């Protein structure tokens, strides 16, 4: 078997908002775990809430890390978090750095999401609209977790939204600043408390006319619409997270021609991308291995 990405420590893929490990044959990290396994990596997908705040999800993740260490005898783990999964991973690394070898943020809103800001403004706190929307999205999150075989996971969509706004993440960053850049658009420290920090992300590039077959992807089209909600990082975002907002630790690249869902390999059949998202994970696993992680 190919052992080119047989990292020293296991890799945990941490999903984001409305995420899951798998529903039937459909994986959140589509084709990524399988590809890493085939290249010799030991990969796990933890079971955490589809919608909740960063700390609640992080506490769930930490418990599973302890269980995994007992099961496989690993001293530490490598965390790769997509979207809110990056904040979940950062929280665990901040409170238990001795258990974490590395944190990698993939399209993570490490300085908040302007889309979350707009959604937050659309609902007046305590009013009926907010209550109804929160109830519906929480129920949807519970439905997703039930479909994935985990119906008892706690869900709170309003807490999740508040945790992803610019203000919410700013408060989070004051408590857990590890790996953050000291200037907007810069890189953060590559290592803090013996934890290595990395990030990569993409942006939606070009006009609709230039995208040809990508216009067949309805999710990509929706993310293109969401781009109009951004003011600080207009045309420098992936539809959900701004380019510079994603920066953490060693920034591998933050302008891949990929939208927010492309980075977990969710593309409509027939659409085309110049970058293979799965290869980014394989390359990164090689990077972790070369770093002794």
UniProtKB/Swiss-Prot annotation:
GO terms for molecular function: metal ion binding; triacylglycerol lipase activity. It catalyses: a triacylglycerol + H2O = a diacylglycerol + a fatty acid + H(+). Pfam families: Abhydrolase_1. Substrate binds at residues 17, 84. Optimum pH is 8.8-9. Changing residue 137 to V: Increases the activity toward tricaprylin (C8). The lipase is slightly destabilized at 27 degrees Celsius. InterPro entries: AB_hydrolase_1, AB_hydrolase_fold. Gene3D superfamilies: alpha/beta hydrolase. Residues 10-206 form the AB hydrolase-1 domain. Optimum temperature is 29 degrees Celsius. Stable at 10 degrees Celsius, but above this temperature the activity decreases. The enzyme is completely inactivated at 40 degrees Celsius. The lack of a signal peptide at the N-terminal suggests that this lipase might be secreted by a signal peptide-independent pathway. This is Triacylglycerol lipase. It comes from Pseudomonas fragi.
């Amino acid at each position: 078997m190919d052992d080119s990405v047989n990292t020293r420590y296991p890799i945990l893929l941490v999903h984001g908002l409305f995420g899951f490990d798998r529903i039937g044959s459909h994986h959140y990290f589509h084709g990524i775990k399988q590809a890493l396994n085939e290249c010799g990596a030991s990969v796990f997908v933890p079971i955490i809430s589809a919608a909740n705040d960063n700390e609640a999800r992080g506490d769930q993740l930490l418990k599973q890390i302890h269980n995994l260490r007992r099961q496989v005898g690993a001293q530490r783990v490598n965390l790769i978090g997509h979207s809110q999964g990056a904040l979940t991973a950062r929280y665990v690394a901040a409170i238990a750095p001795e258990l974490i070898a590395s944190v990698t943020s993939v399209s993570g809103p490490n300085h908040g999401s302007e889309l979350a800001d707009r959604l937050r403004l659309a609902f007046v706190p305590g009013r009926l609209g907010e209550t109804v929307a929160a109830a519906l999205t929480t129920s949807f999150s519970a439905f997703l977790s039930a479909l994935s075989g985990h119906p008892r996971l706690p869900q709170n969509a309003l807490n999740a939204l508040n945790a992803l706004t610019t203000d919410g993440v700013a408060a989070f960053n004051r408590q857990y600043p590890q790996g953050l850049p000291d200037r907007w658009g810069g890189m953060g420290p590559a290592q803090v408390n013996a934890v290595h920090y990395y990030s990569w992300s993409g942006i939606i590039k070009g006009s609709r006319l230039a995208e040809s077959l990508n216009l067949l992807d309805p999710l990509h089209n929706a993310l293109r619409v969401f781009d109009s909600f951004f003011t600080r990082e207009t045309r420098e975002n992936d539809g959900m997270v701004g380019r510079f907002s994603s920066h953490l630790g060693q920034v591998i690249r933050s302008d891949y021609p990929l939208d927010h869902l492309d980075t977990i390999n969710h593309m409509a059949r027939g659409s085309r991308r110049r970058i293979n998202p799965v290869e980014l994970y394989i390359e990164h696993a090689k990077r972790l291995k070369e770093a002794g992680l």
